[in-house]
Structure formats: structure tokens, C-alpha cells
A protein has these predicted regions:
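A ligand-binding cleft/hinge motif common to bilobed small-molecule-binding domains
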Residues: 18-25, 74, 78, 97-126
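Central regulatory/effector-binding core of bacterial HTH transcription factors
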Residues: 1-24, 93
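Flexible hinge/capping segments at coil-to-helix
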Residues: 26-64
Length: 171
């Protein structure tokens, strides 16, 4: 929400954010890349390994989530509501990169993009909790305000991002 507000006020020429996102009518978005989030737990919760869990079954365990002012929180709030549950985190992290260390410390279960957890997963510090419910895919998006002309640096940066995405998606 902060990046979108800054774009709407003309404080920035573009922003790179994750979905879901509520955009103003003049803003346009370009999908840059999809990503998948996973639910992870630390060694204190090893007893949760080895089977698929329903979200409802996991509500008894502490949950670490981003703050309620973030779109990630809104995403998980909607995910829980769509499964007839209420999102009730026990700990709110300020940034996504804080979730893995909090999970490793045994403070609870946490949702993170898969690539954020890869090192901790490889080291055996955390593991993926298999869910019965499917977490929807999210996207990294470039957002620009169609009502404003971006400066040269912003245009070049957007061109580079789009070019990089095109090359990654080439056969």
C-alpha cells in the first residue's frame, strides 16, 4: 500500500510490488514473475512433518505473519476466509525476511515465498508443512501510473525489467 500511495502522489515513477494489489484507475501493471509461498516450521514443530494438514488443524499452533497493514496480510486473510477460517497471527513481522529467523527460533509457523526459505530448508533448520488447501500463486508486478510520464531513468529501468522477464520466459 505504501508504494502504491507514493506512486499515486507522484513521489515515485514506478514501483515493484507483489499481488494482490489495489491500484488506482490510472495505474497499469505488468506481470514480472510468479512465485509460490509455502508454510514453514522449525525443529520445535517436527511432529508436523510427514502428512498433509488442513488449515483448521494448524490453528492451534502459533502463527507468524506480516503486519495487518500489508497486502500479504490481506492475501492470507482472504485465503483463510475462503476456507471459512479467521487469520489470527500470534506474531507480526515487519518484513518477509524476518519470518524465517522467527520460525527457526521456534516462535511459530510462517508463510514465506519458497525462495526466501531455500537456504534454511537446505540446512534442515526449517521444513515445509504440507497443506491440504492450495496457496494461490502470487506475482511480482511492475506498476506505473499511466497518467504521468516517467523520467528517463524510470523508463530505462522498466525497459530493463521487461527485457529481463522476456528473456527468462523465452523457450
Amino acid at each position: 500500500p505504501q508504494a502504491i500511495r507514493a506512486l499515486g502522489r507522484g513521489l515515485v515513477d514506478l514501483c515493484v510490488i507483489t499481488t494482490p494489489a489495489r491500484l488506482e484507475s490510472t495505474m497499469r501493471r505488468t506481470l514480472l514473475m510468479p512465485f509460490q509461498e509455502i508454510l514453514i516450521a522449525g525443529r520445535d514443530f517436527e511432529f508436523l512433518q510427514g502428512r498433509r494438514w488442513a488449515l483448521k488443524e494448524l490453528q492451534q499452533y502459533p502463527l507468524i505473519c506480516l503486519g495487518s497493514e500489508t497486502m500479504t496480510y490481506a492475501f492470507y486473510n482472504q485465503f483463510y476466509l475462503s476456507n471459512n477460517l479467521v487469520l489470527q497471527p500470534d506474531t507480526e513481522a515487519a518484513t518477509t525476511d524476518q519470518v524465517v529467523p522467527l520460525v527457526k527460533s521456534g516462535l511459530g509457523l510462517g508463510y514465506v515465498p519458497q525462495n526466501f526459505a531455500k537456504d534454511a530448508l537446505a540446512a534442515g533448520d526449517v521444513f515445509t508443512i504440507q497443506l491440504k488447501e492450495e496457496i494461490p500463486t502470487r506475482h511480482v508486478v511492475l506498476v506505473q501510473d499511466g497518467g504521468r510520464v516517467p523520467n528517463a531513468a524510470a523508463r530505462e529501468f522498466a525497459r530493463m525489467l521487461n527485457s529481463s522477464v522476456t528473456q527468462q520466459n523465452a523457450p
